[in-house]
Each structure stands twice: as structure tokens, then as C-alpha cells.
């Protein structure tokens, strides 16, 4: 459903000094834009919550208006800002190719489709920034119905797996199937199914497994209809969501593109400082539970917001272009020319940020907190946990799962309720929803969390322990402290 254009805020004139990296783009720009109306039509994917800093937050907080150029060649310009929301990248791409949109955000795989579609139409689009991603591959995953006995991807041979067609999850699924040594045409049946259809189907047990992208795997888990058995991190295949722009538009209005990216950088700063506040805003706009939004956007999140073109993300795009061939969609698209980092580098410079410093930083958003039960700083996050208590503005943090679950028992005994409980997979270092995770308790009573039961069992066997589900872990953790 399209959003109404947002009004332009009356702000002071902004001096826009592009870096020398934009000289070529500026050389081809018109000498004057006086009395011109410039359309800034942006396609968003609001429910794809890791795109929030390139769409939803910019729109809701009116950040674009703050940075659009209003002096020099833009002194007399009127901006026609348009927003349109999509549930996936494919229809967004169609409207970009049809020149109904100028900028859009999507993942690496649908982004490669975007570039290929532009080339087929005799045009070009360029990938201008990453918004959020995982150098390991988290963000895509495979779930089964909550009560399914399937615990591993290998158990799905000969079965049916649904997935949103041409999505980044589709690309992940094809690569995961190939890694199993399976023929995707013979050893597994892959059918197309949108998230809004898959949710009820999982709940009713009408599908055996479903692959999806941010945030639906975790949303289905959180709402109790599914259980994740495979995370993209297991394939060690980097993935990201980012923003693209029509190359012609960027050449005509490079300062407008940089303004959009400066707005994205501010959105990133705001959500990093107050992840709970903006997770609630995302829930208000999209209906995606704040607990799931925080799983991605909070400290040590399942993905990391990152607006730099790390080598892993460049490789992710190359892999996505190669995956097109698995679908019979060969294209002359080249990742090196498809990515254009001049605009994001200029945005960093104008925002007083060091692009090169961020480029080499692979750390997740750090956790700077004290244990809610002991008051001591949390210095080792390997077994850190968190509880977002319903009605509380901030997540409580803990140095151990035992401390968290002991506190959870006290919260519930006092009539409180947890909006969410978070733990971290000991092997893959990814943030998990505690109720659907597996646990191993060792001989010393220390709890460790795992995505998969077999990993928990292996750890328990090696440490004279036993495997527990969440209920068992709660009972064990209640005796901590």
C-alpha cells in the first residue's frame, strides 16, 4: 500500500560539498536546477526490518527532509518525496525499471535480479550501500512446524520446502541444498510461498518446512508456530540488505543520493543508541513484534547494521549473481561495476565519519551493560543473556544464562511477563530466542545455548552434561545465584 508523500520540513540551507569521488557524476549533471521539481521516489520493505535505516525510520522521522540540498543549483528546487512500501524485492524492482521509483532497498539476491532487470531493459542500476547484514550469513533460515520431529536440514531430503520465490532466502536455500549434495530438481521439492501464507500453513502443519528472510523465520518462532532448524550462518555465506538507485538518477542528482545516505546514517545512529525505542516504533508501523526487531537491531544482534562495502558483502553479491545461473537467469551483470561506493563515502565524509575505519570493523553492536542481578559489568558475552520484561523500556542483561533464568522465575512469580528472552548460540555466536533453543548443562551446572539439538548433545557428551529444552533450562537456572 503506497504511503502519502511526506511534507518537506522548512530547514536551513545545507552546504553540500561532495568529495572528489563524485566529480565524474557531477560533470554530467545539469548546470542549473532552478524552478525544478525533483522527484525522490523511494521503495521500502517495511516488514523486512533490517532495511529500516534505509526506509521506515527515514520516513517516520522525516530525516530525508533534513539533508536534501537547498542551496546552489538546488536553491529554487521543490522536492516531490514519494514513498511506497513492498513486501519483497521483486515488485519493487519492477517499479524501479518502469521509472516509477528512483531508490529502493532489498537484499543481495533480489538486488542481483534488480541489476539484471535494468540491463535487460537497456538501463543500469547501482548498489550504493549496505544497510544491514551478516558476514557469516545470518538473516535467512529454515523453519519447520513447532511440533515437527525434524531437527536437521539433512532430514528434509525427499520433502517439500516452501520459500518466497526470487528472495534472498531462495538463494540461501538453493546453496544449502547444493551443499548437501542434493539435486534441487530431484532430491527436494521447492515451491513458492510468501511469508503471509507460510505462517498459517506452518501453524496448521500444512507444509513440512519453509525458508525465509528477515524477520520471518524468527517471527514465526517468536509467535510459537515454528522452530528454526537452519540458520544461514551455518553455510558461512555472507548476506546483506542494501539500497540501490537508478544510475541515470544518481548521475543527474548525486547530491540527492548523498542526502538519502546521510539520512540513513542518522537513522543508524539513532537506533544504535536506543534500540528498544525504535524497535517499538517499527512494531507500531509494521506489526512485527518489537522483541523480534530488537533481536536484529539490539546489541550483539542477529545481524549488524553496516553501511560499508566489506569484501564479504561484495562476495555475497558475486555469489548471488552466480545463483541466478542456478535459476537459468544468466546475465552480463558484474558485481564490481554494479557496486558504486562513491556516494556512501561522500555521505560518511559529510557526516564527519571515517569510512575506512568502519570498513575494517567487523564487530557487532557492542553490549555495554551490567548484570541485572549482580550489578557487575558484563565482560564476557559468550553466554550472555537478556530479558525484555513487558512494560519495561529497556532490556535487562545478564552475564550468564543461569542468572537470566533465575531472574525470569522471580519476574514470573511476581506476576510479570517477559516480552522476550535472548540467549546466544555457543558455536555460531548468533543471538537466539531462548524458548526455541536447546541447552546443555555441564557437570558444574553451567548452561550453554544452541540452535540445534545435535550440537547441544555433542557438547553435553563432551562435558559430562545433559541436554535440556527451555523448560528444563528454566528449572535448572532457577537454582542459580
Please name every model-derived segment.
Residues 26-35:
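Sec/Tat signal peptide C-region and signal peptidase I cleavage site
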Residues 58, 139-149, 239-255, 440-442:
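A bilobed periplasmic-binding-protein/Venus flytrap-type ligand-binding module shared by bacterial periplasmic
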